[in-house]
Amino acid sequence: MSQRRRRSLARPAALLLAVAASMALPALAADTAPVTLKDAYAESFLLGTAVNDDIVAGRDTRAQALVPRHFNALTAENVMKVEELHPTPDSWNFGPADAFVAFGQKHDMFLIGHTLVWHNQTPAWFFQDAAGNALAKDALAERLRAYIEVVAGRYAGKVQAWDVVNEQIGEDGTYRDTTWVRGIGDGDELMRLAFTYASRYAPDTELYYNDFNTWRPEKRDGIVRMVKQLQAAGVRIDGIGMQGHWGLDYPAIADIEAAIDAYAALGVKVMITELDVDVLPLTKEGQIIGQGMTHPQFQLPEFKRFLDPYRDGLPAEVQQRLADRYAELFALFHRKRDVISRVSVWGVHDTMSWKNGYPIPDRTNYPLLFDRQYQPKPALDTVLQVPRKR
């Protein structure tokens, strides 16, 4: 065979190989493309985060890009709290909350309004009459009804869920001495009123109770009792949000699992909400610590160095502990995916985390899955790996 004939045969063969290779490239790219959180857990539960107004409004553009890539559920961090929506008796401010809803709808996300009933971030006037005196029980109940009518009614059909009541049960399982409990006079009645009104004005919206330290046996049992009394009264409650403000070594996985099982046994949805993992010293019992840290002794330089040891960066060994902790938490969540409907981290990147200022102000914390440069941390990779190993 002549050289010319060989070359003429080689040309179509080479062309076929080139076409085949070009067709294979997209498949190869798809196989090696980094998986996202929502994709990794698509068959397990929703993967959510909390967003602030900077993200929604586009002032934090890099975080805004990360949100729809990794998450399919959104909680309003602050813009749906009473002090934001209804700051004075004569004023309403729906702009930021409306923008939150529009952002979530644009990206086809499951939206959680947060929150209708909470003693914090609710202005003092809400509990007072025009003269500044405490409202009588019936007047406060009517104010609650009217507020829920306006807010839950406005967003009915736009948000898929509400954290109706937030943080009203204490560590011993009884009701906390909050402005809401004092004003209504009975915690059980407060719950019945709040969930009744929410169900009335948002009939197709899921209704949740949300709280911290829900893993503690005494508090867990108090929440279980509260849910049972609502159910016995025929009042709808659809889920329990277990806030995940946890640390590198607490709470024990067994305690979290026992709480998940107890809430699931009620026939309601279970969600892990507000998840972040604190790496700093003195974080457990944050409300108590925050009060104690106001003492002048703790303002001395040596205490500041002890309390804020990672201002210049997180050591590799602590970074690894953080990754290991996230891995064991998500391994539990994945194992319980038949009863857990959503896991939400409380923020996108470390800079925006409330843990930089709580329970001790002006610290540098590292509780989330993306760092201050918006880069994924080793913890993110461990979380992504969990479903692949099961």
Give short role names for the model-derived ranges:
Residues 38-42, 61-72, 98-110, 152-156, ...:
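Acidic (Asp/Glu)-rich catalytic clusters
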Residues 33-37, 125, 154, 163-188, ...:
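Aromatic-rich peripheral "rim/lid" segments of glycoside hydrolase catalytic domains that contact
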